[in-house]
Amino acid sequence: MKRLILLIAIITGAATSAWAVELNIDDFFVYNIMTHHDVTAVQVKGKELKQYKLSSFRSITINNNAKLAKTALRYIVKDAKLASQKEEGTKSGRLLYGFYVFKSGNDKNRYLFFRLNNPDADVVTDITVVDMEGKATFDELKQMFK
């Protein structure tokens, strides 16, 4: 019986997200959104990221789609509440960009970065979201995005 319980625990653990911390924005990195005509998506894993102390990188840029941009921003605002470290920029009470760090139980952190690409528009239609995992520090990643 103990073996069965252990096997179920292992299978369940393997079936969960590969990311160190699960976030609401994960729902945005699904095939039907990433292949939408208003979305440009990038995913990178492996040796290319080693020099940046990252193990995973994925991003989506939404252009000219208020519904998708608003949904992404709503998820980001929810996730920001879970961040252990954050930096945000606002203008007239409007969130323009955010950089968030999420600590995990293992030696990797998860990082979420976003910015509005049309900050002066009345309606948010363009947004970029970058989701990363690795051992880089908050300051190292901020330097990469300057």
Sequence positions of predicted segments:
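Bacterial Sec-dependent N-terminal signal peptides
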Residues: 1-25
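Short, well-ordered, aromatic-rich surface patches in folded extracellular/luminal domains
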Residues: 133-135
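Polybasic/polar functional segments that serve as interface/processing modules
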Residues: 19-109, 117-123, 137-139, 143-146
